[in-house]
Amino acid sequence: MSLLPVVMALLLTAACAYQPDAASGDGSRELTVFAAASLGNAFPEIADAFVAEHPGASVTFNFAGSQRLRTQLDFGARADVFASADRRQMDLAVEAGLIAGDPTSFAGNSLVVIVPLPGTTAELNSAVKIQRLEDLAGNGVKLALALPEVPAGRYALALLRNLEAQYPALEPGYASRVMDNVVTLEPNVRGVFQKVALGEVDAGIVYRTDAATEYAAGKVQVVSIRQ
């Protein structure tokens, strides 16, 4: 499903449902969007396109981990759109009566392992060079993951377990050995990316979209998971 038209439709629906007493006298609409941190690149561009097509509208973003956003909503924060990175947090929001209508799936993503780009200061200062998945379980490796409470962290652990089960080259206990090398758990996937880009860790697991931006191209590279 294409990201642009679906998110545009979500914003338009929110604008139509906007409470009249919250609108300014000139008929403008200010929409508040709570979105997973991994959407921080795509959503502002979509919002710009939406505002261009709907004069008088404006969009304000709150980007954070999906679990944190759902908790904020649970404690009374107001939002017109909640874009979660996983179904679990959306289901919890629905169960709590925080969501109007039925949730819509608008995009998919995948996880990748990133390391500092060769030749950068971060890579040159790294004592460990990660070239294969096996290397993540080596001695002295420093790995960054997102907190297990947020989707990226939960998905990363599932990825490691799945890799161990699917690839014979990864010996039994691989996932546990990799987890032993985790030195920081970040509140969202953007934090993981920054740790790698700055050379504070040797590798991290992030969404593919985070590694595909123009900014990322000059900072990190993706380690192939093909064995």
Locations of the language-model features?
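Active-site-adjacent helical/loop segments in soluble small-molecule enzymes
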Residues: S110
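Exported/periplasmic ABC-transporter solute-binding proteins
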Residues: C16-H54, S58-Q67, T71-D74, D86-R87, ...
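Central helical "cap/lid" subdomain
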Residues: G97-T104
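Bacterial N-terminal signal peptides
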Residues: S2-A15
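Short, structured active-site "lid" loops
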Residues: A77-A85
